[in-house]
């Protein structure tokens, strides 16, 4: 067993960091609830894709 963080967790962490940066920028630019909803949905969708991909690729 390795002590390093699994790649899929690193991917999720990067995705969260990226999303947070983008989200903060958008909130500063304009508080547009439709835009924020859209961004949240996009984020959830992309996170779901990462998780589904990792499940398929994860060693049994």
UniProtKB/Swiss-Prot annotation:
Induction statement: By bacterial infection.
Subcellular location: Secreted
Keywords noted in UniProt: Antibiotic, Antimicrobial, Fungicide, Immunity, Innate immunity, Secreted
Keyword Secreted: yes
Main location: secreted
Keyword Protease: no
Taxonomic source organism: Galleria mellonella
This protein's name: Anionic antimicrobial peptide 2
Known tissue expression: Hemolymph.
Task performed by this protein: Antimicrobial protein. Has antibacterial activity against the Gram-positive bacteria M.luteus (MIC=86.6 uM), L.monocytogenes (MIC=86.6 uM), and S.lutea (MIC=86.6 uM). Lacks antibacterial activity against the Gram-positive bacteria B.circulans and S.aureus, and the Gram-negative bacteria E.coli D31, E.coli ATCC 25922, and S.typhimurium. Has antifungal activity against P.pastoris (MIC=86.6 uM) and P.stipitis (MIC=90.9 uM), but lacks antifungal activity against A.niger, C.albicans, C.albidus, C.fructus, C.wickerhamii, F.oxysporum, S.cerevisiae, S.pombe, T.harzianum, and Z.marxianus.
GO biological process: defense response to fungus; defense response to Gram-positive bacterium; innate immune response; killing of cells of another organism
Gene Ontology CC annotations of this record: extracellular space
